[in-house]
Every structure is written in C-alpha cells, then in structure tokens.
Amino acid sequence: HKLPGRVGDTPLCGAGFYAHPQLGACGTTGVGEAILTHVLAFEALRRASERPGEAAIIAASLCAAASRHHNGAAVGLILVRPDGEVAIVHCSEHMSWALAIGDAAPDSGLRRDLSPGT
C-alpha cells in the first residue's frame, strides 16, 4: 500500500537498480525509503568495485546500515560485478532469488542461511 503520489525506489536509477559497464549491475528490494536514502544499488556497486572479491561483505554491510537507519526495514539486493562475482544479501527473513551461470545447474533460495548478526 502506497500513499497517493508516493514513488517507490524501483524506478529510480541508483536506488532500485543501477548498471554500468565497469561496475556491474545491481537490483534492490525492500522498504523504498531505506533504499532511496542510501542510493543502495549505486553505492553497493561503487564500493564493490573498490574491493574486488568482497562484494558480499560490502553489500551486507550496506543493507544492514540501511535497515538500521530505518527501524529494521527489510532491505535486500542482488549484485553482479563484471568479473562474474555475485552477491545476494538481505536484511529480512525472506528474499527469493535464483541464479544461473553458464551450463551450471541453477541455484535458488528464499531464507537467510546466516543468523541476523552475521
């Protein structure tokens, strides 16, 4: 349910999604205000580009910060770097996702595998 005139984060480049040839691509989901105020998709890609191999750690940290600053809001993202590194993280009990790379069998998930503090 959205208030009249409210625009969510999804259509806003940098918040709900972002793609760049040198940075990769990222899509977000969750409470729009938390995602918008942190420009989550862009920031996750920008920071992951500075520390290759650590995209999941960086994305998890950004999601946790966005969630904390908005009273535990549900926030999640899927990030893919140009080198193929993938990060799928969320600060919520559930976030459905699926991943298929090349000829490998697809993978998918719904629940967090880690405790909320990790």
PLM feature spans:
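N-terminal nucleophile
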Residues: 1-118
